[in-house]
Amino acid sequence: MIENLSGNQMLLGLIIGLAVLIFLVLKTKIHAFVALIIATVVIGVIGGMPLVKETFPDGKSLGIIMSITKGFGGTLSGIGIIIGFGVILGKIFEISGAAQRMAITFLNLFGKKREEEAMAITGFFVSIPIFCDSGFIVVSPIAKAIARTVKKSVIGIGAALAGGLVITHSMVPPTPGPLGVAGIFNVDVGQFILIGICMAIPMAIAVILYAKGYLRHKMPFINDEDGSLISIKEFDYNPNAVISLEEKDLPGVFTSFAPLVLPIILILINTVLSALKLKTGFYGVLIFLGQPIIAVGLGLLLAIVTQLRNVDRETALREMEKGMEQAGIILLVTGGGGALGQIIKDSGLGTYIAQGMAHANIPLILLPFLISTGVRFIQGSGTVAMITAAGITAPILAAAGTVNPIVGAFACCGGSLFFSYFNDSFFWVVNRLLGVTQTKDQFRTWSYTTTIAWAVAGAEVLIMNLFM
């Protein structure tokens, strides 16, 4: 601990600050970003940190405002532009029809009897540039049409789609939440993408097995013309549903996938070349192009050039500005999480907690996972849950030095998937669009699906912690 600061007093400040954060998010009209900053100030004040910058005898400077601004700016300096580019890219995917083209491509690739797999993979890719809610709204009509065409449960197909969406959204940058966590933990984005994809695959498989093995048989329903659920046995077969979708004016396969695949490939090339210490000549150019800001920017430019050819300038700019509005909220929340983490780091509270857990023989890797799980269950937002957990635990794990930062970051991301229910907007999007109205069925459709993904993520984090 910093001299003149009490570990127990700072810990009390943290507990009260988190209680204030949860109260403000749940019971007031105060936005999560403002609540994060208020909670950060409460932690510092109750913990005894100087209100303004103060220099101690050992030469260290400390102050609540200094820590807040340092944490906020430091977190966003590396990822702010990437988040902005990524959210705008997502808006382009929405209005261009690229997401629908992805869905149809995977349906054709997987063929009959593998509709759940096709929808899960579609969600897996679509969610990288597009938010879960928007992605499901855009692609769910295709899932419904597929269910009517093959006479399969729309619940199983829809849950597989939603599962693919939320898994990637929670685990793989450059989606905003994981990217924010990567920034707070200061881990390499390329490594985070590669490991995130590897972690997401078993999670998606588990969701597919649940959709095919349980939901398809226990909830054999299809949407009627008015959107309500009816038994498959009562439904009139319509073999032309998918054909009509394929005839829509959508961008081509290459045009749809290239703006998404290009940045990922460039970032991964950068990671590999940097690891091999190949940084001169042409390798240096590739490393430059593989910097996340440049790579995502190139993907955005490619999307503008190829996917907006049939969209008028006014519409394109208006939709991209909507994306910028969404980016603003994400940037503020992410920066707020960074400010929270900086208070914990600067005060020495992270070291204090790490030493206490070490003496108690409590596995440190459980801390970010359980905090993310708890915040998620209490207030509903997966992004807020993982950012809050990262802000609290990144300095603690760094002080301990026994947990790989990448593993800690994924623990924050995985914990945010726990039991989506009434306080999660995506819970309502999925169930309402699928026509599920009974609470028990809503839990079976979506809450259990996310909890399965959460359990697999937890197991993967524990295994990773043994080897990394």
Model regions and ranges:
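Long, contiguous bundles of hydrophobic transmembrane helices that form the permeation core
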Residues: 2-11, 194-319, 468
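Juxtamembrane and boundary regions of transmembrane helices in multi-pass small-molecule transporters
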Residues: 150, 191-241, 414-468
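Hydrophobic transmembrane alpha-helices of multi-pass solute/ion transporters
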Residues: 1-88, 101-105, 109, 266-336, ...
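Juxtamembrane helix-boundary/capping and inter-helix hinge elements in multi-pass membrane proteins
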Residues: 94-99, 109-113, 146-157, 183-190, ...
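Hydrophobic core segments of alpha-helical transmembrane domains in multi-pass membrane transport
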Residues: 13-26, 37-47, 83-88, 123-126, ...
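Hydrophobic alpha-helical transmembrane segments of multi-pass integral membrane proteins
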Residues: 80-86, 109-142, 331-337, 360-400, ...
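Alpha-helical transmembrane segments of multi-pass membrane proteins
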Residues: 112-127, 150-170, 190-197, 201, ...
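Re-entrant/interfacial helical elements at transmembrane boundaries that shape
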Residues: 87, 101-104, 134-146, 175-185, ...
